[in-house]
Regions:
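Extreme N-terminal, non-catalytic leader segments
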Residues: 2-25
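Hydrophobic anchor at the beta1->P-loop junction of P-loop NTPases
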Residues: 31
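P-loop (Walker A) phosphate-binding loop of NTP-binding proteins
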Residues: 34
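ATP-binding Walker
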Residues: 37
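Walker A/P-loop
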Residues: 40
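ATP-dependent small-molecule kinase phosphotransfer cores
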Residues: 53, 57-106, 110-117, 142-143, ...
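A glycine- and Lys/Arg-enriched "phosphate-lid" helix/loop adjacent to the NTP-binding pocket
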Residues: 119-159
């Protein structure tokens, strides 16, 4: 697994240079990391630079379930969401030549993790806890953080 540290500077430099990279990838590139690390943002940039299709698993799940993830958590619960997430990721791994932004908790599932490690190129995005907290603090789209002690919960997830 590759370890990348995503920064605003990297994003700016990639967008500014408008660099195109010829990607002869037979496997998917799967971006993995905590919520708020920048998987979707960086995934779109990599997709544009390589002409690979970009897929956001959370967006696909919302489309399939006809509701936002926060609503899925509220109405159906986290267990239902994780099952939908697993089905979506396993389906996407059968395709190729895509940049896939994984939901923050998807890689925790052993089946998902094993399939990604076997059938894709996984790229772990990481940043420090302070930056993650800033990026996710006021985001009400993240159901795992919509609790009273969300700062404590987030720090616990990070560990």
């Amino acid at each position: 697994m590759l370890n990348c540290i995503y920064t605003r500077k990297l994003r700016h430099n990639c967008e500014k240079s408008n660099l195109k990279i010829q990607a002869n990838v037979r496997k998917n590139l799967v971006l993995v990391g905590m919520m708020g690390v920048g998987k979707t943002t960086l995934g779109k940039i990599v997709s544009k630079m390589t002409d690979l299709k970009f897929i956001d698993t959370d967006a696909n799940i919302e489309k399939n379930c006809l509701m936002k993830i926060s609503e899925i958590f509220k109405r159906k619960g986290e267990k239902f969401f994780r099952l939908e997430e697993k089905k979506e990721v396993l389906k996407l791994l059968k395709e190729s030549n895509s940049v896939i932004a994984l939901g923050g908790g998807a890689f925790i599932d052993k089946t998902v993790r094993d399939n990604i490690l076997k059938n894709a190129i996984s790229i772990w995005l990481d940043t420090n806890l302070k930056d993650l907290n800033k990026r996710t603090k006021w985001n009400n789209k993240r159901p795992l953080l919509n609790k009273e002690n969300n700062q404590k919960e987030f720090n616990k997830l990070y560990e």
